[in-house]
């Protein structure tokens, strides 16, 4: 009768240790080591993603590089200056602008 009582108490403890990975396997390797090796082997490699600043346009060209080239070409002037100067020049040629207000 005492043997059954010990087995009744011992079997759940051994099972609990094996489930938690604190027990050892046949050849002395711990369950946790085996699990961690398998987990890292199955882990997918991270996908390298481009940041939003390095996104590409429809032609597959890098937008940041293109913007740097455009700004260098413009001399770091905003786009509105070019468009505004063209508009003023056209209006001046047509005689629609007052020369005192727009020198």
Swiss-Prot record:
UniProt entry keywords in alphabetical sequence: Gamma-carboxyglutamic acid, Ion channel impairing toxin, Ionotropic glutamate receptor inhibitor, Neurotoxin, Postsynaptic neurotoxin, Secreted, Signal, Toxin
GO cellular component terms given for this protein: extracellular region; host cell postsynaptic membrane
Cofactor binding mode and count: Divalent cations stabilize the toxin the in alpha-helix conformation.
Signal peptide: 1-21
Biased composition (Basic and acidic residues): 55-65
Domain of life from the UniProt record: Eukaryota
Tissue spec. comment: Expressed by the venom duct.
Entry's localization field: Secreted
Residues recorded with modification 4-carboxyglutamate: 82-83, 89
Propeptide position ranges: 22-79
Cofactor(s) in the UniProt record: Ca(2+); Mg(2+)
Chief location: secreted
GO molecular function annotation: ion channel regulator activity; toxin activity
Annotated segments matching region Disordered: 34-83
Record's function text: Conantokins inhibit N-methyl-D-aspartate (NMDA) receptors. This toxin has the highest potency for the NR2B/GRIN2B subunit (IC(50)=0.11 uM), followed by NR2D/GRIN2D (IC(50)=0.48 uM), NR2A/GRIN2A (IC(50)=2.1 uM), and NR2C/GRIN2C (IC(50)=6.1 uM) subunits when tested on rat receptors.
Family per similarity comment: Belongs to the conotoxin B superfamily.
Other known facts: The mature peptide does not contain cysteine residue.
UniProt name for this protein: Conantokin R1-A
Lineage: Eukaryota, Metazoa, Spiralia, Lophotrochozoa, Mollusca
